[in-house]
Design a protein with these regions (language model features):
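Structured alpha-helical
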Residues: 1-125
Length: 125
């Protein structure tokens, strides 16, 4: 059991990566939604899902595509939802494969962000 303020450890990185979420709805129907990460942390992510959101408390399969177009698959619990019609989001807490997440995504995030900003410098015409 963790208190809300203890759950989030470490930095969160603002990084948009393609994601796919799969979960079962209340009727047992498999739901699939695609979107983007808003930010990632050491053990979770905030994701933007434009069409549909899973329920709070549900367990989802989260697939994130890294910069080399490889899929990183983890399991996560939906902690909260932002039901903003223009920008719906789900806050996810990993429940499996946390070390894989950190090694393949979180630990590489600062370098990836720096590379994105470096390429932006050349866009100022």
């Amino acid at each position: 059991f963790m208190l809300a303020d203890e759950r989030r450890r470490g930095d969160r990185y603002v990084l948009a990566m393609p994601v796919r979420l799969e979960w079962k709805d209340g009727n047992g129907q498999t739901m699939v939604e695609e979107g983007l990460t808003e930010n990632i942390g050491a053990s979770g992510a905030l994701v933007h899902l434009p069409r549909g959101l899973p329920e709070v408390g549900s367990i989802v399969n989260l697939y994130v595509i890294d910069e080399k177009n490889r899929e990183v698959a983890v399991e996560a619990e939906v902690l909260r939802l932002e039901r903003n019609a223009a920008h719906p989001q789900a806050a996810l807490q990993l429940v499996s494969s946390i070390e894989k997440w950190q090694k393949k995504l979180y630990d590489k995030a600062p370098k990836r962000i720096a590379a994105l900003h470096a390429s932006d410098e050349y866009d100022d015409f």
